């Protein structure tokens, strides 16, 4: 009975340590340059919008346009 209680307490303690460590290291990355490069690449991709007549199923339409689902989703005048 004592051994069972000790094992349960040990498992709970180790679980708590794992959760604390995981939460502490969540936003840390060893290679910051890689993270920065990836962030810059994805921000450029996000800023590119589809112009008038371009497909909009993978990108948003530029301001003043709306995505109209004809046969192929296309950016048209709003």
Swiss-Prot record:
It comes from the Eukaryota. The modification Pyrrolidone carboxylic acid is found at residue 48. The keyword Signal applies. Pfam families: Conotoxin. GO terms for cellular component: extracellular region. Coiled coil: none annotated. It is found in: Secreted. This is Conotoxin ArMKLT2-0312. It comes from Conus arenatus.
């Amino acid at each position: 009975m004592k051994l069972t209680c000790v094992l349960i307490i040990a498992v709970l303690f180790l679980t708590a340590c794992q959760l604390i460590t995981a939460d502490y290291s969540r936003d840390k990355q060893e290679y910051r340059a890689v993270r920065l490069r990836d962030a810059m690449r994805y921000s450029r991709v996000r800023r590119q919008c589809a112009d008038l007549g371009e497909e909009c199923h993978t990108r948003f339409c530029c301001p003043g346009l709306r995505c109209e689902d004809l046969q192929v989703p296309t950016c048209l005048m709003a």
